[in-house]
Amino acid sequence: MEITFFGTGAALPTKERNTQAIALNLDPYSNSIWLFDAGEGTQHQILHHSIKLGKINHIFITHMHGDHIYGLPGLLTSRSFQGGENKPLTIVGPRGIKNYVETTLQASLSRLNYPVTFIEIDDQLHYHHEGFTVSAYNLNHGVPSFGYRIEAPTTSGKIDVASLREIGMEPGPKYQEVKNSDSFIFNDKVYQSSDFKGEEKVGPKIAIFGDTMPCENELKLADNADLLVHEATYIDGDRSLADSHHHSHINDVLHLLEATNSKQALLNHISNRYNLSDIDVIYAELQNQYPNLKFKFVRDFDTFEI
């Protein structure tokens, strides 16, 4: 799996950062791409990447602030002409996302040539698709704002070809039965499939947060995650400014990373008060403060394997 950041700034687009948009490539589990938020200019950012709009089959919106949704109407209409025709799309988000999309399309006299399903969240959500589990919990941002926990499916262990050949089974269609069942019959004898394949591989767990100040539901979302994607709007000074705007201070995020035993954090939604050189200096200081934690401030178009 890969995660790509098409927008890493907060509130307003700048020359260095676009507003929020994150793409999650589900390969090798699925041929799909999921998009998290679609700030202004998202479709233009995607033009600079190999991702095609037609492959996006889910869009998850964290909350209804403009820097997270202003790019959605244009992206939806462009999808009609960029490989999305007749390909269903599911949009998940806070209550109001359906009205926002339908109103903007109606006002601009736009029509989509593919079906759209809306799932609106009031408090929490547990959603299953193609073996993935998505859990959403309300955060604390002054408006309904959600974080999403994505759990990839567990995959079967690799077939032990040498062991199967020892019992006389050569590679062929029968191997799929060994891979996908608990037991199989070969030459009138019953075998346990687990004796002929490696251990199951648990899929990665990813938590993608909307804007928030610290709250209890963050712990549920981040628990033992392989990756946290979290806002870092305020990365220096005291936390009073972060609190007054219902955002997190960088120390809150790193404490969350540590408390939940998560493996690493990618930090985005960075205020335009910080330029790139400011961030480099602050990052070096934070690495000295938290030497045992793995974290990184991301930039537009950064891609990471999960």
From Swiss-Prot:
Q: Where does Zn(2+) 2 bind?
A: D67, H68, D211, H269
What is the active site of this protein? D67
GO terms, molecular function: 3'-tRNA processing endoribonuclease activity; zinc ion binding
**Could you describe the subunit structure of this protein?**
Homodimer.
Q: Which UniProt keywords apply?
A: Endonuclease, Hydrolase, Metal-binding, Nuclease, tRNA processing, Zinc
- Name the family the entry cites: Belongs to the RNase Z family.
Task: Name the EC number(s).
Answer: 3.1.26.11
InterPro entries in the record, alphabetically? Metallo-B-lactamas (IPR001279), RibonucZ/Hydroxyglut_hydro (IPR036866), RNase_Z/BN (IPR013471)
What NCBIfam families has UniProt attached to this entry? Answer: PRK00055.1-3, RNase_Z
The protein's required cofactors: Zn(2+)
> Which positions in this protein are listed as binding Zn(2+) 1?
H63, H65, H141, D211
Q: How is the cofactor bound?
A: Binds 2 Zn(2+) ions.
The answer on whether this UniProt entry bears the keyword Metal-binding reads: yes
Its biological purpose:
Zinc phosphodiesterase, which displays some tRNA 3'-processing endonuclease activity. Probably involved in tRNA maturation, by removing a 3'-trailer from precursor tRNA.
> What is the name of the protein in this document?
Ribonuclease Z
Q: Which reaction does it catalyse?
A: Endonucleolytic cleavage of RNA, removing extra 3' nucleotides from tRNA precursor, generating 3' termini of tRNAs. A 3'-hydroxy group is left at the tRNA terminus and a 5'-phosphoryl group is left at the trailer molecule
